[in-house]
């Protein structure tokens, strides 16, 4: 990967981790102060706003990244495309607010707490004006990360300062909204320095041309959104609330790990879109090959670690009462590898090529398999069955997308480098397995296992002269000498 891609990846990774840490730090405090009733009310209203946001966004954020990245070297065209997409998003947001008002004045449960509902709806406006997609498309990750992390730090301080008792629900909602989209107002103000709307007339704008392709992304988003909630919903109907709780504990840990792994995708999408639109196919293939190998390099030990350390991890993060989550975590952990591969081939290869119809087919296949597996496995195996269903469905999606994307790839997916990662992971597994038999606290067991496992895995890759291990080692030596 080029230097700028490495830097962008690190910055995006920092941004992703900060997004994961904010709720981990603030939620335990907020839940004790506001109690289940206050937290539940905010979450309920926020989930409704979330669905309205999904509809009003119409797939624009993901679509806009690709379209702006294509023309980012042409200042006039970049300005025009950005203005068109921003205008379209604002129009859709206007209709979204009409829906917000209708719901607020017709649904009794929401009408009783309109200030809270309207406060949370601020995310609709800030998301439209925030043009987060523009900064991703132009790869301005330094600005994105500094703003996002700063806002989250301020929001965390504000939450601990202002949320003092169970009546501070509005403060909690406002702070959470600001932590999520508060930096968007700065994005909008800064946009004036990045584009020039005087280069074209209003009559030249053609927002209609963006509707059809954005609708395709909206369809994809809807399928993915349904698929993500499917296990929990079906488990809730077919089994108990406790089963949902056990599944959620395992699922959240896996999704957090997956978010760290897939943070590279946010960096690669604009770069790949630009390479394809400008005809730099050789650069595209070279970067894609290296990025895929990096994904496998990280995903394999991550999956192995979660499977082997499921017991102490659940013990630390959820407590001993969540013991049934241990086999659930072990069953669902493989999706890190499966989703990593399928997501890379779908969103970093097929989507930049304009093959979103194929991506929709892959997502649909995954969802159908998930439904079938859930119907078969949940009645007998409860939350473990739901976890197995997730892994099987994501495996099927990975197989389908490998088959579909294969004809467009100019690099080998599986080679000797991947074999080294498998062998290195196997050696790491042996070491971690023996450490796991130690008689010590869960936290110590996790820390020692992760440290020793990482060292063993890294040393093996260094001995085999792996590109990433050698690069990381040279960077470490350079920093150490400096």
Identify the meaning behind each predicted range.
Residues 1, 169-173, 185-228, 267, ...:
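Interhelical loop/hinge segments that connect adjacent transmembrane helices in multipass membrane
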Residues 1-24, 76-79, 191, 204-220, ...:
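N-terminal membrane topogenesis motif
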Residues 4-62, 97, 101, 156, ...:
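Signature of the first transmembrane helix
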Residues 28, 57-73, 250, 254-299, ...:
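Helix-loop junctions and terminal segments of transmembrane helices
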Residues 104-120, 306-338:
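Interfacial segments at transmembrane-helix termini and the short loops linking adjacent helices
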Residues 114, 124-148, 334-365:
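Membrane-interface junctions at transmembrane-helix termini in multi-pass inner-membrane proteins
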Residues 114, 121, 145-193, 213, ...:
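Hydrophobic alpha-helical transmembrane segments
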Residues 433-482:
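Membrane-proximal transmembrane or re-entrant/amphipathic helices at the cytosolic face
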